[in-house]
Amino acid sequence: MAETSTVARPYAKAAFEYARDHKALEAWSGQLASAKQVAADADFDAKVVSNPKLSHDQKTALLLEVCGELDESLCNFIRTVGSRGRLAALPAIAEQFEVLRAEEEKRVDVTIVSAFDLDAAQQDKLATALKKRLNREISITTRVDRALMGGVILRAGDTVIDGSVRGRLTRLRDALSA
């Protein structure tokens, strides 16, 4: 995984800079997501990407055919990635592209895991506090995990804020056993 991320980063940066310079971030984002979905498919990976009998150009051509209508510049980008034998890194490239796009747009996806369903007012209050703290636009996804017993866990990028009862009990147990 670390190797894939290392390989993906410069490709994602190049794709991002091209898309930003040509004011096509949204288009590239959607089309890269489509290509990512195809490349990450287990059947496609087993039959095409990991098939040693196919050349890099054949693999790339099959990927582009399955993806359907893509911008010509994105097709050229995928051909470049494929010609270097890096199609397996395409999902990681797409993910890195989205990280760069979110940073550029000062936006972050936040996952709120709570013990119980949150109403709209509670979600808005959390979103406002996070927007102020992170200085970013916030997109919220909520999930319920009854095992938390109470409170919430907030995940925003690399930042995790654990305000759950389960988390507090775990920290208390660790402090007492130290």
From Swiss-Prot:
Keyword list, A-Z: ATP synthesis, Cell inner membrane, Cell membrane, CF(1), Hydrogen ion transport, Ion transport, Membrane, Transport
GO molecular function: proton-transporting ATP synthase activity, rotational mechanism
InterPro entries reported for this sequence: ATP_synth_OSCP/delta_N_sf, ATPase_OSCP/d_CS, ATPase_OSCP/dsu
Family annotation (SUPFAM superfamilies): N-terminal domain of the delta subunit of the F1F0-ATP synthase
Protein's cellular compartments: Cell inner membrane
Major place of residence: membrane
This protein's GO CC annotations: plasma membrane; proton-transporting ATP synthase complex
Membrane topology: Peripheral membrane protein
Keyword set includes Transport: yes
Any Pfam family the entry gives: OSCP
Chain's role: F(1)F(0) ATP synthase produces ATP from ADP in the presence of a proton or sodium gradient. F-type ATPases consist of two structural domains, F(1) containing the extramembraneous catalytic core and F(0) containing the membrane proton channel, linked together by a central stalk and a peripheral stalk. During catalysis, ATP synthesis in the catalytic domain of F(1) is coupled via a rotary mechanism of the central stalk subunits to proton translocation. This protein is part of the stalk that links CF(0) to CF(1). It either transmits conformational changes from CF(0) to CF(1) or is implicated in proton conduction.
Name of the protein: ATP synthase subunit delta
Protein source organism: Chromohalobacter salexigens (strain ATCC BAA-138 / DSM 3043 / CIP 106854 / NCIMB 13768 / 1H11)
Source organism phylogeny: Bacteria, Pseudomonadati, Pseudomonadota, Gammaproteobacteria, Oceanospirillales
Gene: atpH
